[in-house]
Amino acid sequence: MDSILKSYLQIFFSFTILFIALTSSGCTRLYFGPNNVPKFSTTQPNELGPTVSVWEDGLRTSGDRNEFEWWYLDAKLDDGSVLVTYFWKVHFIGDQYFIGFNYRDKNGNDFFKLKYFRSKDVSFSSDSCDVVYGNNSFKGNLQNYTIKIDPDDFDGIGINLNLKSTLKPYRPQDGIIKAGDDYFAWLSAVPNGVVSGDLIVNGEKTRLSGSGYHDHNWGNTPLQYLFDNWVWFRGEIEDKTIVAAVLYMTDKRGGYDVPILYIADSSKVHVNKFGEDGLYTRKSTRITDLYNKHNEPLFRELDMITEDGFKVNIIGHSVIDNSNLFKRGRMPYPIRLAMGAAKIDPFYTRFDSEMSLSIEGETPKTGFGVFEIMDLK
């Protein structure tokens, strides 16, 4: 009993000391990193050329400290349901591997679960997208993908999907945003594709069909060291696919807003702009019902216009996912409490969204998509 009590007291006092150390300014320094860091450069990597190679969707990190990587899929299905899954690897405090799976049925009923895996149960390939977590997998070659979620890992709900790309892969320049040696990277491997396959619920299969999207992200430094937040969108209007984002750099990195806009159909790419002159953005409709009152302003509406006559309006409506990132990352409660005292509460929010596209000289058209907010403060 004495040894149990001693162990308990050691743990208690360790967390108490940690809590005191992390409160207020100490907590802020720990989370946001050092002040003396390289600023974002207006000249970004541009060496790979316009053609995306299969290896680019393979493993891009080596497992070094502070590296992270994920492969993402979302699908808007013909029956009105929405499906999202992502395979993550993170190397911040130890090595963590997990899958997030979110399914919203046509009636608005939500299912969401995170499942963690041991390092011995996961594998990757640097030659192509070949990601295996236990009996779950995400595999493909830029043209065709298979995505499997094992119902045994997700409370009886799973998928066995095929994704066939209808557009060439897209990345802005090399897809890498750097500040010194620190970087964040993004590849839209399948800007738009046709989804088919099965939804499995308690052993019963239902055929699914619709449109899908797959991208791949990786980096070598905590996201909050680079960005305050970002917004991202992918959607469809008739035959056109739209991918849009604005990355809001931290003041320490220069405080730049970096817009990205891609509009394409099977015939050509109509817009491909990355942090360029001639692309303007506006955010509006402040969110008041999802975050605490101390949170910095975040908005559910984004407008983008180009100097050559393209206008995009995006509005996030029903919430698909709204998660505190500390809770999702299984951060210990005393640290979460300390972060909260320092008014640091990062959230990830995803909306089922509407959009409109106006092209000069044409009638405006409307469509749908997925709108994401990554709040890192």
Predicted features by range, described:
Residues T28-K377:
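Structured soluble/peripheral alpha/beta segments that form catalytic or ligand/cofactor-binding pockets
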Residues F12-T23:
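Bacterial N-terminal signal peptides
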Residues D2-F13:
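Bacterial N-terminal signal peptides that target proteins for export
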